[in-house]
Amino acid sequence: MSTTTPTHIPFRLVRKGVVMSPLPGESTEVEGVLNPASGRTPDGRLHLLPRLVADGNVSRVGLAEVTFTDGVPSGVERRGVVLAPDEGWERGKNNAGVEDPRVTWVPSLGKHVMSYVAYGPLGPKPALAVSENLTDWTRLGPIQFAYQPDLDTDLNLFPNKDVVHFPEPVPGPDGEMAYAMLHRPMWDLGWFRPGEGVHLPAGVTDERPGIWISYVPVAEVEQDIRALTRPRQHRLVALSEYPWESLKIGGGPAPIRVDEGWLLIHHGVSGSIEDPFAQNQKVSYAAGAMILDPADPSQVIARSDQPLMAPETDEERSGTVPNVVFPTAIEEVDGKLYVFYGMADAHIGVALLERTS
């Protein structure tokens, strides 16, 4: 990436309000509802899959049907919990969680593909599950990144978050059509082994976490859906470039196809982080966008140099983690695109994605 990349992104985000807040007296939500995935059930009804945080920062994935006022998402009706940290690898001695789901409907597979962060014995690890109806999920297991000698490291050593799949096959580095996923490795192993510090892959000189892409050939997934957990051909897509994202960046909702290419809404973080796994941070999370080349989605062809949305409202500026706008889902409703986002790790908001030119 270079700052010579065009910075014009012909879209803007317009706030439409809060759609979900913690339900008083609900034990699974006492520390917040946030960072939702989304999808439609077979009958076409729109649902969110919010991260529900119980006491002790234990997260589950819920299901909530979206309600509307004058055609605009305005609330939800809860439908229960659809994924909990029930597996041993999703729980540690003093922690547990299935966190920050992203869900992509993949028509060629006839399935919703959920990525989530399993907060287990060795910290955060990405994992996958699939469903045909948003209610019944089948775990595919933790993601196992294929060894790539030219990186001079094993991606499985590192915490990894913000995994999200493209909704259709894209060209891989070898020209073969593949199911691709974006992800965000974090190179500092000091959280696991004090003093170990940062271990960068070969060719990477910036230790700030950025967005990567990995691929699985279509033929392998058609033979066995579990192949999605074994991505390879890892490539760096983007690193922090601008002041509003000076600490790190990460992918948001599944990329959507627009005239210019693949539109990726992402988050950027500025401020200071003393403990990467502490809830209270002196940081600001904002939403931006980039456009990826449809012929090679590892290439960024345009990128916003200013955030499309930064924390401004009370709900975005005050919460479990203050000053957070964290986009994680995007859906079309009556020809309009709405982005759902976490607000200060406490509430869920919605914004209209509008074309500006």
What are these regions (language model features)?
Residues 1-31, 35, 39-96, 105-160, ...:
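Beta-rich carbohydrate-recognition and catalytic domains
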Residues 164-168, 252-254, 327-332:
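Beta-rich, blade/repeat-based domains predominating
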